[in-house]
Regions:
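Structural/interface elements that position substrates and couple domains in central-metabolism enzymes
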Residues: 2-487
């Protein structure tokens, strides 16, 4: 059973220290580990300065540790060396800059040397999906191999990205042991610690909001982890019985959300069919503490929620378990961009009062990021929305996002313009579609949209501002253009 453990001086000084001294070398436990980390003797290497690694490095820097930031991207290394982060995560650039000033932040591109120079190595590189929907562990395997080449006796390693259950013990740990010639539990310590952050408040999540979930390759690894993590996780640690369980736990978090978003999308569609406003029903239903209806939307994006179901489906296929609900939920959410584009085009028809002519139309999409408040475009539903509009031959697609200045992935699309100028994006457009719930979009008025019909794919606009004939929203029932029946 999971348990929350908070380590304090009294516990270490009394019975806990006697137990721990029998499990691990007596000279590196308790306050000794904390002292060596804060003094800089035990350096912490963060592999991957991306959306997970950058806030993790920042949290350790803020705790007083000496951190080695490791990244293979020359652009990322150059920015970090100047005290800047390539991602606009609050507090990260400030932590980098302060760390450099205090000579506690080092930036490496050499993964092996970073392993040689550090005590605690945190693997924070992403695990993506291949073209066929399988986990792409290329980056993790590369880092594991290079850590192994520089590994020393007594070192600690933690794998942080979400992975299919069994990845750490069946793949990553054997690679490290092979490269290093060392054995986990006897010579070094291996942990799995799934990241649990929400972009836009990542440092706060690490430091204040959640306990660190950890599991070890054995008792020694786990005990070391229980001493290290409370140095930055003020909520302490929550231990689980084994690494495979910790890997599974993180996937369950994401799948829960994906399936419930799919449920919300289906219920929104049902409410539209019977002429009922889903949003009104949702608010009333969620007043009961056992109901947690999620928000429907134009699509599910990011590197987490749409990815984790695929990891479970990949693993379940190997285990010969049919996870039908997860499949259906993923299918529903993947179909939402196409469904919403069809509904948005109906608004265009209603305004023009004649046949829709795609080759003469300009469409404005509000949001390139996968959700509001972030600049992360990974698996953004906007890409699929673009494809759907281009299938019907739209002349020009404009995209506005207050946080995304450029996106190389858009180079593969024709007649697509990305701008940070909202007025320019809306000028003389024929149709507007809200995709990301950036806060500035919630205050849009018909004066700004110049009378163009607008489809709210996130349910954030003030409906009182818009004439029903020119306004559509997921789950609005018959309080919108056309009859109650839709789709």
């Amino acid at each position: 059973m999971a348990s929350v453990d908070k380590i304090d001086d009294q516990m270490i000084d009394q019975d806990f220290s006697s137990q721990l001294s029998r499990a691990i070398p007596p000279d590196i436990f308790g306050n000794e580990i904390a002292h060596r980390i804060i003094s800089g003797e035990f350096k912490i290497a963060i592999y991957g300065l991306g959306h997970v690694g950058s806030p993790m490095a920042s949290a350790w820097l803020r705790a007083g540790a000496t951190v080695i930031g490791v990244d293979k991207s020359p652009a990322v290394v150059e920015k970090a060396s100047k005290g800047k982060s390539h991602i606009p995560e609050p507090g990260v650039s400030e932590a980098f800059s302060t760390g450099l000033t205090l000579d506690r932040f080092k930036i490496y591109s050499d993964q092996v040397q970073a392993s040689r120079d550090s005590y605690f190595k945190m693997i924070c590189v992403p695990v993506l999906l291949s073209e066929g929907g399988c986990p792409d562990l290329t980056a993790v395997k590369e880092v594991a191999t290079n850590i192994g080449k520089g590994l020393k006796k007594g070192d600690v390693i933690a794998l942080n990205p979400s992975v299919p259950p069994g990845t750490t013990e069946d793949l990553i740990l054997p690679m490290i042991e092979h490269e290093s010639g060392l054995v986990a539990e006897n010579d070094f310590y291996m942990l799995y610690n799934p990241e649990r952050i929400y972009e836009g408040r990542a440092i706060l999540d690490i430091e204040e909001r959640y306990p660190a979930i950890i599991a070890g390759a054995g008792k020694r690894s786990l005990e070391i982890g229980k001493l290290i993590y409370p140095l930055v996780f003020k909520r302490g640690v929550l231990t689980v019985s084994n690494i495979r369980a910790a890997e599974t736990e993180k996937l369950l978090e994401g799948v829960y959300r994906d399936v419930n978003i799919a449920l919300a999308n289906e219920l929104a569609r049902y409410c539209e069919e019977i002429g009922v406003n889903f949003w009104e029903c949702k608010e009333a239903a969620n007043s009961q503490p056992y109901c947690h209806l999620h928000n429907p939307g134009v699509g599910v994006g990011g590197a987490c929620i749409p990815v984790y179901p695929q990891f479970i489906l990949y693993s379940s296929a190997q285990a010969r378990v049919d996870c039908e609900m997860i499949k259906v939920g993923r299918s529903i959410n993947a179909a939402m961009p196409a469904r919403c584009v069809k509904e948005a085009i109906k608004l265009f028809d209603n305004k023009k009062k004649n046949e829709f002519v795609p080759s003469e139309a300009t469409v404005t999409l509000l949001g390139m990021a996968f959700r509001g408040g972030v600049s992360d475009t990974r698996l953004s539903p906007t890409y699929e929305v673009i494809k759907e509009f281009q299938k019907v031959g739209i002349r020009e697609i404009r995209i506005h996002d207050p946080l995304v200045r450029s996106d190389p992935k858009l180079n593969g699309f024709q007649n697509v313009i990305l701008t940070s100028d909202l007025a320019k994006a809306l000028k003389d457009t024929d149709l507007i579609m809200v995709i990301a719930d950036h806060s500035q979009y919630s205050n849009l008025t018909p004066l700004q949209t110049d009378g163009a019909p607008i489809y709210d794919g996130r349910g954030i606009l003030n409906r009182a501002f818009f004439d029903n004939s020119n306004y559509g929203m997921i789950g609005m029932g018959n309080n919108r253009v056309g009859a109650a029946r839709r789709f």
